[in-house]
Amino acid sequence: MQQSKEQRVHGVFEKIYKNYDQMNSVISFKQHKKWRDKTMKLMNVQKGAKALDVCCGTADWTIALADAVGDKGEVKGLDFSKNMLSVGETKVKSGGYNQIELLHGNAMELPFEDNTFDYVTIGFGLRNVPDYLTVLKEMTRVVKPGGMVVCLETSQPEMIGFKQGYYVYFKYIMPLFGKLFAKSYQEYSWLQESAKAFPGMKELAALFEEAGLSDVSYHPFTGGVAATHIGKKL
């Protein structure tokens, strides 16, 4: 019986959670942290704000948001992998982040009221959901008018030569890194599949607009291997 995308992705992250943070650094050559830092500068998160990190995984971006909003702010992190959340909980407790609450839930049906958050983020998670537009619409629903929806994700490089090298890396080399460092060749093969199938920057910007967001902009990183998309709710 063929697994659904949701079932397959859930199985992947339930298995690789222990090595996820290390592997992110290995396969991105530690660039993912720089991409997130640049994204946070673009967001200019305000003290005391309320933020939601969708598909929060091990809570790295959740914690960055908590640092930005400060003690008087509030941050929720949501993920469907309990094992990934367990790693995040350890980080949150050790860091003393009382303003963070991590929740087990589904990005396709966010368990929050309309117009709740000032910022709603998703980092390297949108490519793994069953339906991109449904999740973007949910993120738009729960953000306040004037609030910001932000996606940091792998993208499709457009530079000739660079594009081909990117696909070779994702298809052949990254799964080998998964096998060497995390004993998970099959799981990291899935990650390259999801990255290859993900929309390019212009296509994702169009989905942001279709979800009801305005002033949509995108910002490529490292030759377009990743990009941040930002949209505002009117």
Swiss-Prot record:
GO molecular function: demethylmenaquinone methyltransferase activity
Keywords in alphabetical order: Menaquinone biosynthesis, Methyltransferase, S-adenosyl-L-methionine, Transferase
Phylogenetic placement of the source organism: Bacteria, Bacillati, Bacillota, Bacilli, Bacillales
Protein name: Demethylmenaquinone methyltransferase
GO biological process: menaquinone biosynthetic process; methylation
Binding site for S-adenosyl-L-methionine: T58, D79, N106, A107
Keyword Transferase: yes
Pfam families tied to this protein: Ubie_methyltran (PF01209)
EC top class, as a word: transferase
HAMAP family assigned to the protein according to its UniProt record, in alphabetical order: MenG_UbiE_methyltr
PANTHER family: 2-METHOXY-6-POLYPRENYL-1,4-BENZOQUINOL METHYLASE, MITOCHONDRIAL (PTHR43591:SF24), METHYLTRANSFERASE (PTHR43591)
Catalytic activity: a 2-demethylmenaquinol + S-adenosyl-L-methionine = a menaquinol + S-adenosyl-L-homocysteine + H(+)
Classification via SUPFAM superfamilies: S-adenosyl-L-methionine-dependent methyltransferases
Family of this protein: Belongs to the class I-like SAM-binding methyltransferase superfamily. MenG/UbiE family.
Entry function: Methyltransferase required for the conversion of demethylmenaquinol (DMKH2) to menaquinol (MKH2).
Metabolic or biological pathway: Quinol/quinone metabolism; menaquinone biosynthesis; menaquinol from 1,4-dihydroxy-2-naphthoate: step 2/2
UniProt cross-references to CDD domains, sorted A to Z: AdoMet_MTases (cd02440)
Entry's EC annotation: 2.1.1.163
Highest taxon in the source lineage: Bacteria
Gene: menG
Coiled coil spans: none
